[in-house]
A protein has these predicted regions:
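Short beta-strand-plus-loop segments that form exposed binding edges in beta-rich domains
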Residues: 648-656
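N-terminal carbohydrate-binding accessory modules
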Residues: 22-72, 102, 674-676
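Bacterial Sec-dependent N-terminal signal peptides
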Residues: 1-24
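Aromatic-lined ligand-binding clefts that engage carbohydrates, nucleic acids, or primary amines
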Residues: 596-617, 625-626, 648-649
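Short strand-turn-strand beta-turns centered on an Asx-Gly dipeptide
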Residues: 37, 451, 507-508, 616-622
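Aromatic-lined substrate-binding rim segments of carbohydrate-active enzymes
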Residues: 58-124, 192-197
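Carbohydrate-binding surfaces of carbohydrate-active enzymes
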Residues: 135, 146-160, 168-176, 182-192, ...
């Protein structure tokens, strides 16, 4: 199969157009898309935080992202990761940005650097060092004292980037200034001018398109990128469906949603009046940088994500006109050890004290987890990413149309949600019958009307939770109720959307009804192949999940019962506070005995229940977990050699905690270990 189906490549159109590899074409943009030497591309951007991964895992992480269909990487440069102590810069080890960029160059993976100075990313103070707050300077302002410090940061970053910009043959194609900024556009312009003065010279520059700026930046100077999430750990509510996240599952022309950063941004109204617009009616392309590839668990809100959460949202954004899907996060990580303090966001920190996040883990339930685990959503997204690459020149110029203009309402089950994108000759129909934590029923009597084409020939049923994209007038297909996946060497690959009957009408007059998948070995007609979703998810070079059990029962022993239950206090931002180090001194303590030898990819899998847990090696905290029903996992390859014992501390679940737990969590008061295994790929 690997000979039949090409492997995903980084910003793959570059390699298609320039097989000598990594020749630097000209990258531009217009109101529709990015262009590479004039040819339209529809990238998949995946966020990974290089400083949240050990340096020796970067290469495999980038390769695995590429295998998932990611064609561009985004990463924050956290100020307090590299200057935690004033004037003591640390670009070593996991903070070695230059080495990370060199790996991206080696792997032909373009990079967007999110420079800050403010980043957020659930990092302590949003990435701004503690020492800054002793100076009495207003952050994120045009105060010359702040800009002087920002310039020092940018100059330091440039020492890492120099010679690795796109114009140099390097991977850095763009940078983002600040993050979720709502003040005057002149501040962002000051950062851009500063960066260019230092030496940054990139094909394009970006900002987050939310919230609305108090005053705009001149059109064309900085591209706004948007985002959306299926749920948010930052919501104050402990109800299952807090906020307006249902809007992420409706096709709509509005690029700005009021779901992001609601703990810090008060949205008076959400309007698309200025979103993507410039002087004289010119407009920006619809790009995203923060589509929730997963979601973190905060202490007060233990969100549990499902594969269709990210998949449905991605299809909806693509069907709403987006020509760059940027996931936050695509690869999870672990907070590095701080020199002065923990580096996670908490309600006790001086800034970004909105939520309590785990001290160490930043797994994010992402497609690739904290230790590179290929989660179900990784495979769910792969066929979509292949489609975006192989049909990008057809898709990119297409305009989005919205047949149903009803206002989005939570759980609205009265109609099938759909849109189509068309250039007047060809089209793609996008539909979504899924909404997170809502039951949408099967939709009967469905036919789509696009131009002069009505299909299928007879009304059909779209099952509950079905999500898909149907071609009209593309690749020799007049219409199909199957989803295009890819094309290669004259062959065209489609997949059946689960539960949807397949009807394919070809331009030559041939019609196939009730088509059945035959895999990649046997065409359904001429050079057309019909696959199952599972076959499409495994096409080409992929990443093996941790599915092999190396050790069924890892020995463990309870060394100490839990002490008195802690009092769960409400913090400054009106949500429950996470346990302190002192609280964990009262936790139940278990000793885990490891085997004498371990495979290089041994993953510890702890099935426990309780409020939260911490894992220690030789007395040092190495990872932690806010319980939400998923297993607590740890990559044993990160341990010092000859580590024989680990210590697990679990705080008991309490009755009626002021915390949202999903239905997958065991909320029985108390704590315990169900099993501990060692897995491998």
């Amino acid at each position: 199969m690997n000979q039949l189906i090409k492997t995903f490549t980084a910003l793959a159109v570059l390699l298609t157009l320039y097989p000598q590899a990594w020749a630097q074409p000209k990258i531009t943009w217009d109101s529709k898309s990015l262009l590479v030497d004039g040819r339209r591309v529809v990238p998949v951007m995946g966020e990974i935080h290089y400083s949240r991964l050990p340096e020796d895992e970067w290469e495999s992480a980038v390769k695995n992202m590429k295998a998932g269909g990611v064609t561009m990487i985004a990463t924050y440069v956290f100020w307090n990761h590299v200057e935690e102590q004033e004037d003591l810069w640390d670009w070593s080890g996991s903070r070695n940005l230059r080495h990370f960029l060199e790996i991206c160059k080696q792997e032909q993976m373009p990079v967007v650097l999110r420079l800050g100075p403010f980043c957020h990313g659930e990092v302590r103070n949003g990435g701004i060092p503690d020492w800054f707050f002793t100076k009495g300077i207003k952050s994120r302002s045009e105060d010359p004292r702040f800009l002087t410090l920002a310039e020092k940061l940018y100059r330091q970053i440039f020492t890492q980037v120099q010679g690795l910009q796109w114009k140099d043959g390097g991977p850095v194609v763009a940078c983002q200034f600040d993050n979720e900024y709502r003040g005057k556009g002149s501040y962002l312009m000051a950062l851009k001018q500063m960066a260019q003065r230092i030496g940054f010279d990139l094909p394009f520059y970006t900002r987050t398109g939310w919230p609305e700026l108090a005053t705009p930046v001149p059109f064309g100077e900085i591209l706004p990128l948007y985002g959306d999430y299926a749920d948010g750990f930052w919501e104050r509510s402990i109800a299952p469906t807090a906020g307006n996240y249902y809007k992420a599952f409706f096709f709509q022309p509005n690029r700005v949603n009021d779901n992001i950063a609601t703990e810090q941004i008060k949205y008076d109204s959400v309007s698309s009046s200025s979103a993507g617009k410039g002087r004289g009616g010119a407009s920006y392309p619809y790009f995203t940088c923060e589509l929730g590839g997963g979601m973190m668990t905060s202490y007060h809100r233990r969100v549990y994500m499902y594969p269709n959460d990210a998949y449905a949202m991605a299809v909806v954004k693509l069907g709403s006109g987006s020509n760059l899907l940027g996931y936050y996060m695509y690869h999870g990580g672990t907070n590095p050890e701080g020199k002065c303090a923990y580096l996670n966001e908490t309600q006790r920190t001086m800034a970004t004290n909105y939520n309590d996040l785990p001290v160490k883990t930043y797994d994010f339930q992402a497609p690739l987890g904290e230790f590179g685990q290929a989660n179900s959503v990784f495979f769910r997204l792969r066929p979509l990413h292949r489609f975006m690459h192989d049909f990008q020149e057809t898709l990119a110029p297409m305009v989005a149309h919205f047949p149903n203009t009803a206002q989005a309402r939570k759980g609205d089950d009265s109609y099938l949600r759909w849109s189509y994108r068309s250039d007047g000759r060809s089209a793609f129909v996008f539909f979504n019958n899924y909404e997170r934590l809502q039951h949408l029923t099967a939709k009967k009597g469905v036919q789509f009307h696009v131009g002069d084409v009505t299909f299928p020939s007879r009304p059909m049923v779209i099952p509950a939770d079905a999500i898909g994209i149907f071609p009209v007038g593309v690749a020799g297909i007049r219409y199909a109720t199957a989803q295009l996946v890819g094309k290669e060497g004259g062959k065209v690959y489609l997949m059946q959307v689960k539960g949807v009957p397949v009807e394919i009408a070809f331009e030559d007059g041939k019609v196939i009804r009730n088509g059945k998948p035959r895999g990649t070995g046997k065409p359904i007609y001429k050079l057309y192949y019909l696959l199952t979703i599972e076959e499409a998810e495994q096409m080409g070079k992929t990443v093996k999940p941790f599915s092999h059990t190396v050790m069924e029962k890892v020995p463990f022993e309870r060394k100490r019962e839990a002490g008195p239950l802690r009092t769960i206090t409400i913090g400054v931002n009106k949500v429950a506070e996470e346990p302190t180090d002192a609280d964990f001194n009262q936790a139940a303590v278990y000793t885990i005995s490891l085997p004498d030898s371990l495979s290089p990819d041994a993953l510890l899998d702890i099935n426990y229940h309780g409020d939260c847990a911490r894992l220690y090696a030789n007395g040092k905290l190495i990872d932690d977990n806010f319980y939400n029903g998923r297993h607590f996992q740890y990559g044993l390859w990160r341990l010092p050699k000859n580590t024989q014992k680990l210590e697990l501390r679990i705080l008991p679940m309490q009755k009626d905690e002021p915390v949202y737990f999903p239905q997958e969590a065991d909320t029985t008061p108390g704590e315990g270990i169900n099993s501990i295994k060692i897995l491998s790929r």
